[in-house]
């Protein structure tokens, strides 16, 4: 998979969650903040990242840097995706189904952030299993990265697009 250069894209960021985490030491608890951020150009590129620091802004900055390193390309067909797919990660599953134009993004929480920043405007989704934000985002990104256009599938099978689609 080729790496996508984030400097050539106009990326938009969205903070999904900020979590306070604690390390218990002899003198009490040491608190830090973990941030989960999604970045995308609303035109077929999306990525997510996590960052941890003692202050919230630092955690968000680290998460944005991480997200820019993990960009993927999403094949879009019009305003939706080419076909149905289930993305898996851990105990989390996200079902993604293309929808007719004008349907909108029907998705909950973290999944919505990923789909909107990827540039998908019409889609149906259902999250199954784990509802932890990081697992849902990873399952969604996993599903989106496995999508293939009809042309790619036809080329793999050595057939024409017309033969493939009937």
UniProtKB/Swiss-Prot annotation:
GO terms for cellular component: small ribosomal subunit. Signal peptide: none annotated. GO terms for biological process: translation. PROSITE patterns: RIBOSOMAL_S5, S5_DSRBD. It comes from the Bacteria. InterPro entries: Ribosomal_Su5_D2-typ_SF (IPR020568), Ribosomal_uS5 (IPR000851), Ribosomal_uS5_bac-type (IPR005712), Ribosomal_uS5_C (IPR005324), Ribosomal_uS5_N (IPR013810), Ribosomal_uS5_N_CS (IPR018192), Ribsml_uS5_D2-typ_fold_subgr (IPR014721). Keywords: Ribonucleoprotein, Ribosomal protein, RNA-binding, rRNA-binding. Pfam families: Ribosomal_S5, Ribosomal_S5_C. GO terms for molecular function: rRNA binding; structural constituent of ribosome. Gene3D superfamilies: 3.30.160.20, 3.30.230.10. Residues 11-74 form the S5 DRBM domain. Belongs to the universal ribosomal protein uS5 family. With S4 and S12 plays an important role in translational accuracy. Part of the 30S ribosomal subunit. Contacts proteins S4 and S8. The N-terminal domain interacts with the head of the 30S subunit; the C-terminal domain interacts with the body and contacts protein S4. The interaction surface between S4 and S5 is involved in control of translational fidelity. PANTHER family: MITOCHONDRIAL RIBOSOMAL PROTEIN S5 (PTHR48277:SF1). This is Small ribosomal subunit protein uS5. It comes from Bacillus cytotoxicus (strain DSM 22905 / CIP 110041 / 391-98 / NVH 391-98).
